[in-house]
């Protein structure tokens, strides 16, 4: 699996992206585990059934991921992984120190980064024949969601107010039989941290690896 994003996305703020990947299961696997993380948040469905949300908030150097047991959600034949990703798209939680606003005692300066919405996902299935893997790559379909207003005010240092237009929702896009042929593919993020974080201070890049995937505790 590789970090992916919508093919035409600029580094905007307050963005929502839909991702889909259809695949075929000949026989139900003995075990199926899906590992997933996103920048900044995700909602996950398998065949229209919601499985979870995440990841946990973290320092960007240690990116948390979630693991879901999805065996009971799979079916013989066509299946789909559907993910809604949300991205702040800009640095958040900046603790700025100025002459008139000194940093409070005991508070450390937090990492501030700009980012593009990204998804990293891998489904691992064990069968009697051989293990099968479905990982995020350029074959995944992606679409910039029009259901949310992106021009909204911040309600604190981290999050924006949410305005959702239900009438704009694409019906059944989380289902396996949805026709996504008109959706574009995804772009693979390459380079520093998958090319997502554009504002990180790289002076400490000698710490290897800079971004470590950590399972949710």
Ranges and model annotations:
Residues 130-217:
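Activation corresponds to long, low-complexity, non-globular regions
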Residues 8-10, 14, 19-169:
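Accessory beta-strand-rich segments of carbohydrate-active enzymes
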Residues 1-32, 192-217:
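Extracellular/secretory pathway-exposed regions associated with glycan biology
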